[in-house]
Curated annotation (Swiss-Prot):
Rieske domain mapped to chain residues: 29-135
Name by which UniProt lists this protein: Carbazole 1,9a-dioxygenase, terminal oxygenase component CarAa
Keyword Iron-sulfur: yes
Gene name, Swiss-Prot/TrEMBL: carAa
One GO BP: carbazole catabolic process
Keywords: 2Fe-2S, Dioxygenase, Iron, Iron-sulfur, Metal-binding, NAD, NADP, Oxidoreductase, Plasmid
Binding site for [2Fe-2S] cluster: C69, H71, C90, H93
Cofactors that this protein relies on: [2Fe-2S] cluster
Length: 384
């Protein structure tokens, strides 16, 4: 059953599956927290694509269970009871499940029940990489993590640091905010632009051939699917904003050139290279929590050759790049997403919006996501 009214989906030309993906795409890896945020034997709760989950670290390894007892449907997290380190017991009737595989291994209140060994709670694969915790919300064996991460993120020398926060907008509004070529106008007064001496136009006018504004990648060696925004290369940067021929605003004429290489990848992760400095990259995920909220999983990467360089980068990240870039710059993006919420809340915004020439990158992303996603999350998955 569709997540969006069929009448609306029929009016969408070219990317109806994307419009239907209010809850995100199933069968993909998603980052949900940083490794340092989950300690041994201290289960964490979270919601991903509408599903309530529990994550626990046992002997260093992470496991993920669906946070709902099979007996009467209550959330195990209401009162977490782990009588042994390898199991979790429901606080209501003492059904007990193994973290490793979700099997109902015991019932404390009825140890001879025929249900023991016959029932199994849904589990999801978990993998840690670059200090981040990824969950594969899907069915069957997961693909390599590289398929769902941007190029360079997993490079051996790439040191990744970041922050994660919950934003009150649908994940698609976040993706399109990040990948929107002309949204840079909202950053014109950012502290990062001034204090880091960045060159930043007000926007871009498209060149002669709009087909050159994007490049689609659907044959990556590890299976990645993505779109490159090339308007910076094939368009005309606009540094003077005029009304009636009169210049009313100018862009920033800084010395540092950044954001030459911008791309978006399934299941919804942006790569900006270089950014926020010529020797760094930004990788940010827009992870669906439910139809109304998403995790804004922001990371900055910098190649580091040794421990000393990593330590220096950590200090620089906390003192400079986190407050100046991830907050001072990206906070503009957050309120822009939230400002779009009302227009798209009833899904009619997807057919009532009026796009213009520089939205070619957004159109290419919508088409790619519609064609190459690995499955649309539905309420049936959430309740199943």
């Amino acid at each position: 059953m569709a997540n969006v009214d069929e009448a609306i989906l029929k009016r969408v030309k070219g990317w109806a599956p994307y419009v239907d993906a209010k809850l995100g795409f199933r069968n993909h890896w998603y980052p949900v927290m940083f490794s340092k945020e989950i300690d041994e034997g201290e289960p964490k709760t979270l919601k991903l694509l509408g599903e309530n989950l529990l994550v626990n670290r046992i002997d260093g390894k992470l496991y993920c269970l669906k946070d709902r007892c099979l007996h009467r449907g209550v959330q195990l997290s209401v009162k977490v009871e782990c009588k042994t380190k390898s199991t979790i017991t429901c606080w209501y009737h003492a059904w007990t499940y193994r973290w490793e595989d979700g099997v109902l291994c015991d019932i404390l209140t009825n140890p001879t029940s025929a249900q023991i060994g016959r029932q199994k709670l849904k589990t999801y694969p978990v993998q840690e990489a670059k200090g981040c915790v990824f969950i594969y919300l899907g069915d069957g064996d997961p693909p390599p993590l590289a398929r769902d991460t941007p190029p360079n993120f997993l490079d051996d020398d790439m040191e990744i640091l970041g922050k994660n926060q919950i934003i009150k907008s649908n994940w698609r509004l976040a993706v399109e905010n990040g990948f929107d070529p002309s949204h840079i106008y909202i950053h014109k007064d950012s502290i990062l632009v001034k204090d880091n001496d960045l060159a930043l136009p007000l926007g871009f006018a498209p060149g002669g051939d709009r087909k050159q504004q994007t490049r689609v990648v659907d044959d990556d060696v590890v299976g990645r699917k993505g779109v490159y925004d090339l308007i910076g290369e094939h368009g005309v940067p606009v540094f003077e904003g005029t009304i009636g021929g009169e210049v009313v605003r100018e862009g920033a004429y800084g010395e540092k050139i950044v954001a030459n290489d911008i791309s978006i990848w399934l299941p919804g992760v942006l790569k900006v290279n270089p950014f926020p400095n010529p020797d760094m990259m930004q990788f940010e995920w827009y992870v669906p929590i439910d139809e109304n909220t998403h995790y804004y999983f922001q990371t900055l990467g910098k190649p580091c050759a040794n421990d000393e360089e990593r330590k220096n980068y950590e200090q620089e990240f906390e003192s400079k790049w986190k407050p100046m870039a991830l907050e001072g710059f990206n906070n503009d993006d957050i309120w822009a997403r939230e400002a779009m919420v009302d227009f798209y809340a009833d899904d009619k915004g997807w057919v009532n919006e009026i796009l213009f020439e520089v939205d070619e990158a957004i159109v290419a992303w919508r088409k790619l996501a519609s064609e190459h996603n690995q499955g649309i999350q539905t309420q049936a998955h959430v309740s199943g």
